[in-house]
Amino acid sequence: MKSNNNPKAMVVERYTITDRIAHTVHAIAMIVLIITGLKIYAGWEFMSFHTARTLHMIAVPFLLAVNWILIPYNIFSEGHGLMGKISHFTDHYIFGPKDAVRLGGIIKNFFRKGRYPAYSIYDEEKGHYETKLHPVMKVLIVLEGTALFLITVSGIVLYKLDWSLFGLPIAQWIISISGMIAPTFGMTPVGFLRLLHLLMTYWFIFELVVHVGILGFDPHVWKYYKAIFWSGKEDFSDPYYSEYVEKYSRFDAKKEHKQVNANKEHGHQKH
């Protein structure tokens, strides 16, 4: 990371207020759903079944609204024009070749070979992040989206076997599709959906452990928790896992050009 004489210039907005709201609501709703869901399944006695089911059903719309409305809005409100928005989405949330290189560097660092690569990179010239997520998080995002879809689909049937939307028999359609898969495992369609719902719950628990317990175990990443839950800011004077690419000014270009010419003249003098 280059030096900067103005430390304030190196403090940038990492998360908007809507980003922070989305993440906080997502976290609370997910924790409530995991606890109440396991209570309903296992029959724990710390709360009544009625209370657990009520809290579960209250948390569901919050989780879905955040993930299927607010988060997509936050993502695609960045960037200019259609291609700019697509570029922002792929650079920030899709695991690509550069992320593979960073992940390779992270693995090497684990075995004490090389420096831990920066994964939060801000370009001052462009005025936005080039990337801000850990490579592993980009993989988890895709898996979480898939798990969220599956747990929602299976949850519809567990909520009400004949649930419909605008007269469309959604639950029955889900049961019919499940009926094509369930016999392979010697299960009924509803039994298969119940197992799928439970497995996706375990997945979210695993993801929570990886996200908070492992990736967040390093004290140097705690600055990102402060940013996502409170300040929204990232201070690039802290060099851990971050890089601030400074603006390449005309003065820098002239200085570099003069240096190149001086080197050439020095070379000619030698000859």
Swiss-Prot record:
The chain crosses the membrane at residues 27-47, 57-77, 139-159, 165-185, 195-215. It comes from the Archaea. Belongs to the HupC/HyaC/HydC family. Keywords: Cell membrane, Electron transport, Heme, Iron, Membrane, Metal-binding, Methanogenesis, Oxidoreductase, Transmembrane, Transmembrane helix, Transport. It is a multi-pass membrane protein. This is F420 non-reducing hydrogenase I cytochrome subunit. Its cofactor is heme b. It comes from Methanosarcina mazei (strain ATCC BAA-159 / DSM 3647 / Goe1 / Go1 / JCM 11833 / OCM 88) (Methanosarcina frisia). GO terms for cellular component: plasma membrane. Part of the F420 non-reducing hydrogenase I complex that catalyzes the reduction of methanophenazine to dihydromethanophenazine. Its EC number is 1.12.98.3.
